[in-house]
Amino acid sequence: MPRVYIGRLSYQARERDVERFFKGYGKILEVDLKNGYGFVEFDDLRDADDAVYELNGKDLCGERVIVEHARGPRRDGSYGSGRSGYGYRRSGRDKYGPPTRTEYRLIVENLSSRCSWQDLKDYMRQAGEVTYADAHKGRKNEGVIEFVSYSDMKRALEKLDGTEVNGRKIRLVEDKPGSRRRRSYSRSRSHSRSRSRSRHSRKSRSRSGSSKSSHSKSRSRSRSGSRSRSKSRSRSQSRSRSKKEKSRSPSKEKSRSRSHSAGKSRSKSKDQAEEKIQNNDNVGKPKSRSPSRHKSKSKSRSRSQERRVEEEKRGSVSRGRSQEKSLRQSRSRSRSKGGSRSRSRSRSKSKDKRKGRKRSREESRSRSRSRSKSERSRKRGSKRDSKAGSSKKKKKEDTDRSQSRSPSRSVSKEREHAKSESSQREGRGESENAGTNQETRSRSRSNSKSKPNLPSESRSRSKSASKTRSRSKSRSRSASRSPSRSRSRSHSRS
């Protein structure tokens, strides 16, 4: 649309004053006022010609104004005029927008390496308005200049071709759409862009992949950690868990499968229980010295998923540990002390251990009757235990040990029966056995804390029979308080 330039405009002039000044010359589309000048855009070119012819040199707000046709094109494409479709670059105050690209492009060859795109653009402005300039981007010593109009491009080609810029004669070549030069230039530009993009994308992908893998690792660790925390609430269970994890570390595939299966639902808890039983068989073999104790351990660990039986489970684990500790102590005593007293002590302890094992077996049986699901998993675990050859060897060793100990244990049985007949009734004998069981447990715990006090306590216990009676009475009362132990005694009596 035709635009009219107003020069020497008064600073007090407003849009209403300009509209009133141009009233009667046709339809005005836009009034754009600047500091000291302005532009008026008309709908028709003839109206603009009339306004320029008649109003040039007239007074507006006390000032004689200059009214001319606007020479340059619109610099801001804000208003919806026809010229804004050409895509002119914003300049002046509003120059911070992106440069607009046009089809009127010149290739500048033999460009000095010291000449930047800013210098080239400033130099080319003498031919016309430049919208885009670039130097040494696609190729070295070569630049690109884009003009607003075809006439500007032709003027630059005529006037500036062969002129010197920084001591070098530049050669201007029109960049036609079908020319090889443009294709190669555009290709090289697109290649460089695509390469940089692919590099960035690869980097970002690798970063995201590594972050994802680290996330998944941390998630699997946190899952397994939360699992172990929820299951091992007692200290004894957490210790056994840490031992299991140490033994699992050489077999990476198993640990991976376990960490993956941690996120799954609890419907697969039976399979997990079977896997745990197998792992317990592999881990617990060097530590467990009797097959019955080994079975009770594996059963109590397979029950660790059921939170209702936590208290009973703690008792069974601590019993198994106290039995192991007392076995080791009794063996070390029987080896170090050749006297008959130490032998009789170890024999009486082994007898008490046997009874404790029987009770733990009866407890586990009575519990397994109420829980049919855990019984199936235990049966599978016991079948697999019987299949494993290493467990058979250890069972044989345990049976050989028990056979070698059997004559000495029978002698200790006869002695203890004679003592119990002479001193106590049958009911007190049972409470004494329960008391001695508890003594062995409490001593095994105190032994781990204070080892030097062991022999003195055990001697005083065996010498004074009246002290053991009073202890057994007091401990039988405390045993009757705990529900799990009273249940196990009632099962063993029946």
UniProtKB/Swiss-Prot annotation:
Gene3D superfamilies in the cross-refs: 3.30.70.330
Major subcellular location class: nucleus
Region (Disordered): 72-95, 169-494
Annotated Basic residues bias: 179-206, 214-246, 257-267, 286-302, 328-359, 367-382, 461-494
Leader peptide range in chain numbering: none
Listed GO CC annotations: nuclear speck; nucleoplasm; nucleus
A Pfam family of this chain: RRM_1
Compositional bias per record (Basic and acidic residues), positions renumbered to this chain: 247-256, 268-278, 303-327, 411-431
Ranges of biased composition (kind: Low complexity): 449-460
Alphabetical list of PROSITE patterns matching this protein: RRM (PS50102)
One GO process term, biological-process aspect: mRNA splicing, via spliceosome
Cysteine-cysteine disulfides: none
Location(s), subcellular: Nucleus speckle
Record flagged with keyword Protease: no
Record keyword Hydrolase present: no
Superkingdom of the organism of origin: Eukaryota
Keywords: mRNA processing, mRNA splicing, Nucleus, Phosphoprotein, Repeat, Repressor, RNA-binding
Family membership noted in the UniProt record: Belongs to the splicing factor SR family.
Protein name per UniProt: Serine/arginine-rich splicing factor 4
Naturally occurring in which organism (per UniProt): Homo sapiens
Organism taxonomic ancestry: Eukaryota, Metazoa, Chordata, Craniata, Vertebrata
Gene: SRSF4
